[in-house]
């Protein structure tokens, strides 16, 4: 008997599963002990038992949420120094990080964020903090990183590291002529 034929599979009841996701007004961040609903003006703590939707296990940050004074954050200090202690660059970087942590995107408003060295040359400089920033974001959202120097759109399985639960895709150190429009 072939159990996985359409004859047998059609007898199985289907289940409508609603995955939790961000909206235009809020972003969700999932920790081991609770979820956070982050809006422009507020952070609301939500117990998982009260949610009426599901979350990908791989999108849950593997640590408990503990409220701390964000002014003492090493990552915040790093962003400040990586921004050259310029208030404008610092605020821009905070906006970029916020945009990347917020998963609600539309086809008409979906941006590629490009982090580059202050001085662009044919030799990669490194040391400007791009990798640390991406790593930091990767600790908050499910991230897949692809080597931009060797990436080829025409290669079989070019996106094999991207899964249904991947939230962000980072091309690390892309070639000069990388086709962002593709």
Regions from the language model: what does each represent?
Residues 29-31, 104, 169:
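Bulky hydrophobic/aromatic packing residues
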Residues 35-166:
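P-loop NTPase catalytic core of nucleic-acid-dependent motor ATPases
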Residues 1-53:
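Intein modules and their embedded homing endonuclease domains
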Residues 3, 7, 70-78, 182:
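Exposed alpha-helical structural elements
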């Amino acid at each position: 008997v072939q159990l996985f034929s359409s004859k047998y599979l059609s007898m199985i009841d289907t289940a409508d599963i609603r995955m939790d996701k961000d909206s235009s007004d809020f972003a969700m961040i999932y920790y081991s002990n609770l979820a956070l609903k982050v809006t422009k003006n507020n952070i609301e703590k939500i117990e998982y038992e009260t949610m009426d939707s599901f979350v990908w296990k791989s999108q849950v940050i593997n640590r408990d949420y503990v409220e701390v004074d964000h002014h003492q954050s090493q990552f915040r200090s790093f962003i400040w120094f990586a921004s050259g202690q310029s208030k404008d660059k610092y605020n821009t970087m905070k906006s970029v990080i916020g945009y990347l942590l917020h998963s609600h995107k539309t086809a008409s408003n979906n941006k590629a964020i490009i982090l580059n060295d202050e001085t662009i040359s044919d030799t990669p400089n490194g040391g400007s903090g791009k990798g640390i920033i991406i790593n930091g974001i990767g600790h908050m959202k499910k991230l897949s990183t692809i080597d931009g120097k060797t990436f080829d759109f025409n290669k079989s399985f070019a996106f094999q590291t991207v899964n249904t639960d991947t939230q962000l895709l980072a091309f690390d150190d892309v070639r000069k002529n990388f086709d962002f429009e593709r």
